[in-house]
Amino acid sequence: MFDPASFVKEIGPQLKQKVGNERVLAAVSGGVDSTTAAVLAYNLLGNKVIPVLIDTGFLRKNEAEKIKAYLSNVLPNLIVVDERETFTSEIEGMEEAEAKRKKFRELFYSSISSLMRKFNAKYLMQGTIAADWVETQGGIKTQHNVLVQIGIDTEKEWGFTLIEPLADLYKNEVRELARYLKLPKEISERQPFPGPGLLVRTIGKLTREKLEVVREANDIVEKYLDPFNYSQYFAVSFESDGNFVILDGIDAFLYKARATGVKGDVRAYGNIAKVECSDINTAKSFVDTLVKYDITHVLCSLDERSNGKYSIAIRAVITEDFMTADYARIPKEVLEKISSEILQKIPNVKEVLYDVTSKPPATIEFE
C-alpha cells in the first residue's frame, strides 16, 4: 500500500543531498506527473527549483494560461516559454509516429538545455513514471521523457543530470502523492496528457490545419466527457482517405493513416479500421476478429457528411494503471451531441468515430 507521507519522508533527504547548493530546472507540462514532481521538489528545495512550462504549440486550447493560473499558489515562480513556432516548423510535414516522437524529444531537450544554461542549473527534474519507461524499454513507443532507462547519457548529450523522483510510481500512486501535496484538483485529478501533446493526436503527416482541427475537436470532447471522470478521453484527427475491404465476412474501411498498438508486449504499427456498429457496447466481436489482421485500432462510425477531408476519432478509456485499459461505454446520446457539435463547428471534418479497442491490442494514444 503506497503511503505518500512515507514517500516524501524517504525522498526528501535523498534529494537535498543530491542537489546540494545547485539549481534544479523542473520541466512542467501541466499534467499530474511533471507537476507533482515539480511541487515535491519546490516544497523540499525552495527557490533552488525553477519550474518551466515550454509551450510547444501542441498544448490544448488555452492550456498554458490555464496551467499558470492553476499553479499560482503551489508553483508561484512558474515560467512559460513560448517555443510554438520552433516546434511546429521543425516537425511540420513529418509523418511516421516514432519519427515525430523522436524529433519532439530532440527539440524538447535542446530547448531545455538552453534554459539550463540560461538559469545556470545543473539538474533537470522530470515527472517520468513507471509506465513511461516500461513502454519505451519494451519498444512499444518512445516516451520523450525516458532517457537514462534506455541508455541516453544526458550529461554527454545535453550537459545536464536528470532527477526522476517518481520513476518507480504508477499513475494512481502519483495522484495520491499530488493530493497529499495539496495540488489543486484541476491538476491532481486531471486526466493524463502526453508530453508531445496534440502532436501524437494529429495522426500521420503533421500540418498546421490538421493540428488546429484536433485542438478544437479535443476541446469539444473534453467539455462533454469531463463529468464522467473516465481515466482518459480525447480526440485525434487524420485524413479520411482509404478503401473498403471484407475481412472474415466483416465490411470494414481501412484508412491510409496508421496507428500504434501492442501485440504480445511488443510494438505494432498497423491500420485503423472503421466498421458500422449498431451498439458500441457489443463491438468487441468486431475487434477480436479484425485485430488478427494488421489492424491496431477499430472505430465505430458515429456521424458523417459528404464533404470534408478529416476524420475525428473519439477515444475514452477506463484503467487503473494505464498498462491495460478498456474503452468507455459512453451513452449514445452523449456521443451524438459530441459528433453533432464537431461537424457543426469545425470546417473540413468529414466524419466522427468512436474507438472501441482496448489496450492491448491498441495503445491508449494512437501514436
UniProtKB/Swiss-Prot annotation:
Protein name in UniProt: GMP synthase [glutamine-hydrolyzing] subunit B
- Provide the function of this protein: Catalyzes the synthesis of GMP from XMP.
EC id: 6.3.5.2
Disulfide-bonded cysteine pairs: these are: none
Q: Which positions are annotated as binding ATP?
A: S29, G30, G31, V32, D33, S34, T35
Q: Which GO terms describe its molecular function?
A: ATP binding; GMP synthase activity
Q: In which pathway does it act?
A: Purine metabolism; GMP biosynthesis; GMP from XMP (L-Gln route): step 1/1
Cellular component, GO annotation: cytosol
Q: What class of enzyme is it?
A: ligase
Superkingdom of origin organism: Archaea
Q: State which gene encodes it.
A: guaAB
Keywords, sorted A to Z = ATP-binding, GMP biosynthesis, Ligase, Nucleotide-binding, Purine biosynthesis
Q: Which reaction does it catalyse?
A: XMP + L-glutamine + ATP + H2O = GMP + L-glutamate + AMP + diphosphate + 2 H(+)
Q: Which SUPFAM superfamilies match?
A: Adenine nucleotide alpha hydrolases-like, GMP synthetase C-terminal dimerisation domain
Gene3D superfamilies attached to this UniProt entry: 3.30.300.10, HUPs
Q: Name one Pfam family in it.
A: GMP_synt_C
Domain GMPS ATP-PPase, which positions? 2-190
User: Mind telling me which InterPro entries this protein's record contains?
Assistant: GMP_synth_C (IPR001674), GMP_synthase_B (IPR026598), GMPS_ATP_PPase_dom (IPR025777), NAD/GMP_synthase (IPR022310), Rossmann-like_a/b/a_fold (IPR014729)
Tell me, how does this one assemble?
Answer: Heterodimer composed of a glutamine amidotransferase subunit (A) and a GMP-binding subunit (B).
